[in-house]
A protein has these predicted regions:
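A well-ordered secondary-structure block
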Residues: 83-187
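Bacterial N-terminal signal peptides
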Residues: 6-15
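Positively charged n-region of N-terminal signal peptides that target proteins for export
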Residues: 1-4
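Intrinsically disordered, low-complexity segments enriched in small/polar and acidic residues
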Residues: 28, 178, 183, 190-202
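Short, well-ordered surface patches within globular domains
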Residues: 20-116, 153, 159
Length: 204
């Protein structure tokens, strides 16, 4: 029994380590794309050689053209409260293998953020499944293959959004997931903190 507990503990710590690193790296990668879109166009081109996807190679060319024309934007500041809203969704959806922006209790991204502070000037959410590579995650969200309106790309390059928070973790269907939440501004609350012990699935 002690051996089983030790194995489970080590497994949890390993998952926490990669998840935390991935979330931080995704935000850094998003800020690189925002502040240096022309440079990121070259990165995207090198990462998508031979890409077919849902819409075919044209979707990559369209994303590259977008980046080449995009004006640099300020980097997103990070927010602990927004991160906690993202983490709440990871902990809710990951174990069940469900996907989407609606939580198991019907909550939307702005509802989850609002439990850890007050968001200002709009809010949004991006989710990526199955990647454990930050650059691969952000490239996929910018290409936004098969997504009508390119909503994930618009969130990344929104002039309205000034702060963000990300969380990653295990997903029963895809192996992993990463949630990135955005807001125009955020006033942090000091009363609630998201954690794997504090937030059982569906509690938010």
């Amino acid at each position: 029994m002690r051996l089983l507990v030790n194995i489970l503990t080590l497994s949890f710590l390993a998952t926490s380590a990669w998840a935390g690193d991935l979330a931080d790296d995704v935000l850094a990668e998003i800020n690189l794309a925002r502040t240096a879109p022309q440079q990121y166009a070259q990165i995207l081109a090198s990462r998508t050689v031979g890409y077919r996807g849902v819409e075919g190679p044209g979707v990559v060319k369209e994303a590259i053209r977008f980046l080449e024309k995009q004006r640099p934007l300020p980097p997103l500041a990070t927010s602990e409260g927004i991160r906690n809203g993202a983490l709440a969704h990871v902990l809710d959806m990951g174990p069940s293998g469900r996907r989407g922006h609606k939580g198991s209790n019907g909550s939307q991204p702005w509802d989850r953020m609002a439990r850890f502070g007050k968001w200002i000037g709009g809010a949004g959410e991006n989710i990526d499944y199955g990647q454990r590579d930050a650059r691969g995650t952000v490239v996929r969200l910018i290409v936004d293959d098969g997504v009508r309106g390119r909503g994930h790309r618009k969130n990344i390059f929104s002039r309205t959004f000034r702060v963000a928070g990300a969380a990653a973790g295990y997903h029963a269907t895809y192996g992993g997931m990463c949630v990135i939440n955005f807001a125009g501004g955020f006033v942090e609350s000091t009363t609630r903190v998201a954690s794997r012990t504090a937030l059982p699935a569906g509690s938010l």
